[in-house]
Amino acid sequence: MVCTEPIISADCHIDLIWLPPALFTENARASLKDRMPFVTDGKDGPIWVSRNGAFFGLQNGMGSAGRKYVPGEIHRSDRMAAQGLYEDGKKGIRRLTDPQLRIKDQDLDGVRGEVLYGILGAAARLEDPVAASEMMRIYNEWLADFCAHCPGRFAGIASIPGHDMGSALSELERVAKRGVVKGVEIPSTTDSKPLYHDDWTHLWSAASDAGLPVHFHTIGGPKPDFESMAPQESRKAFAVFITGFQLHMAQKLMELIYGGLLE
């Protein structure tokens, strides 16, 4: 049976490693420029790093972690490589973050539009909450400009800080006023306050007033230290971790339901 309905890809991503290399350093406030991610030389090519020691991966690399592409390791990446994605990336052709080139790749896959999640994971790896908030502001501005090129094909989800409710509210209100984005994503970290906590109340109200759906993206549970394990134990632990990766969101759903947020 052939599907004749338009395909909307509801879980797509913009990864930091495919963003313009000077995006954050050029657009950050003067007091925070030295704390922003930037691109420098690495042994396998240009890499994204920060001065406090955070590592984000190879520029235009594979997946959100910016890994080096290894043929035969991940079938989805093999398909992307077959279309020249990673070779183009080495040449500085950012197909994933150039709106016209991304639309061409959508057409190649028969996709009519994408919901685009952002850089919350990378912001957490920065381990600098104030700088991460600035990083998200810059990204959200870039995202709005990106989606504005073809709003019928891109539904951008703004990244919202989760470490401080004042920062979260401020950025939510800013992106709502800015327009273009279609929703906001709140961090779903294991150490954040449960969603039924009163601290979240103002955020829910602000999102509702702005007409912006609130999104959560799974990050899985606590990650085991695979490198400290024997090879077979590591394989088993990884299989358990990756199989249960999506189940972590059941906790968030229960917090929403029993917090009365859906009533």
List the predicted regions and their residue ranges.
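Helix-coil boundary/capping segments in enzymes
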Residues: 1-263
